[in-house]
Amino acid sequence: MSGNTFGKAFRVTTWGESHGPAVGAVVDGCPPGIPLTEEAIQVMMDRRKPGSSAASTTRKEEDLVHILSGVFEGLTTGTPISLMIKNKDAKSSSYDQFKNLFRPGHGDLSYQRKYGIRDYKGGGRASARETAGRVAAGAVAGLLLERVGIKTFAYTLELGSVRAKNIDPEAVSKNPFACPDMEAAEKMEARVNEVRKDGDSLGGIVQVQAAGVPAGLGEPVFDKLDAQIAKAMMSIGAVKGVEIGAGFEAARLTGSVNNDPILEDGFETNNAGGTLSGVSSGQDIVVRVAVKPIPSISVPQQTIGLDGKADTIQVGGRHDISAIPRVNVVCEAMLNLVLADFVLRQAQVRALELFAKQ
């Protein structure tokens, strides 16, 4: 299986399965001299770990990250950084009933038909557990970005058709749904409780942004900044759509409205979402991500078995009601990885200038 590595200059490979002994990531290309501790990474990991919100699974994982290599006396050495998170609360026996059945909405059927074999205990690499490695690596990337003045953050814009109307960044940390609108957060909680009684699940929208991004990040044509952001977000299992800036709303605007007027001190608007022709403009990067409902639900569903015959399935078990808000930090981590990669690639573009100044 290929496709487990992301990035060119700042490269991340994730590894491990949901019900294996551990999951993790290897970060290759991180510059030396960046202060890095397990505690610094853990801050981001704690936002993703199970049981962190009313909509999350009852599976209890500490998600403690262990740095195995690439750090000496608290500083990165420039060599590969290996990160490991042990799985401690996997209950594989609960998946035995799915050995010969395909779960709707999961990768069971497509993996079986691609590889002729699948990990039916938790979904293997298709499990959301894989994202723990992404978040750990994204935390490392975030520390690199801090050195150049870039800050990323994410919040719940919408959950179960309840949308935040008032955006107060300080409210995000004050409610279990990471919503910037406290009134909307209360409605989200009511909606989650309602759907939980039905054994169903919810989707929503995450907004992730980056401030302090300098102009010049991104490459022409196939490696555009917005193209790589879209790829990064769409690589998250629960994500079904991405828009940047005005996004799909831009299709309804005239050019005179959609264009961002250029002023002496910047731009008047940000419909472009911080990118022009695939290169950062110096404005904030603004991304919205559509997250599908969790496919593991207690509602009876039609399916087929390995023998191809019709059957009925009820998944149940310890599953999230919604991937939100745990997926928020995953989106933030992926934006970190994209930006860290382009920061290092831009340094290569201007390398002659840097050496000439020495």
Curated annotation (Swiss-Prot):
Entry EC no(s): 4.2.3.5
Reaction(s) the record says it catalyses: 5-O-(1-carboxyvinyl)-3-phosphoshikimate = chorismate + phosphate
GO cellular component, one term: cytosol
Alphabetized InterPro entries for the sequence: Chorismate_synth (IPR000453), Chorismate_synth_AroC_sf (IPR035904), Chorismate_synthase_CS (IPR020541)
Required co-factors: FMNH2
Cited PROSITE patterns: CHORISMATE_SYNTHASE_1, CHORISMATE_SYNTHASE_2
Pathway the protein takes part in: Metabolic intermediate biosynthesis; chorismate biosynthesis; chorismate from D-erythrose 4-phosphate and phosphoenolpyruvate: step 7/7
Superkingdom: Bacteria
GO biological process, one term: amino acid biosynthetic process
An MF annotation (GO) of this entry: FMN binding
Binding site for NADP(+): R48
Keywords for this protein: Amino-acid biosynthesis, Aromatic amino acid biosynthesis, FAD, Flavoprotein, FMN, Lyase, NADP
Enzyme class: lyase
Cofactor binding note from Swiss-Prot or TrEMBL: Reduced FMN (FMNH(2)).
Binding site for FMN: R125, A126, S127, S277, K292, P293, I294, P295, S296, R318
UniProt subunit comment: Homotetramer.
PANTHER family listed in its UniProt record: CHORISMATE SYNTHASE (PTHR21085:SF0)
Stored NCBIfam families: aroC (TIGR00033), PRK05382.1 (NF003793)
Described function: This reaction introduces a second double bond into the aromatic ring system.
Protein family per UniProt: Belongs to the chorismate synthase family.
Name of the protein this chain belongs to: Chorismate synthase
Gene name as annotated: aroC
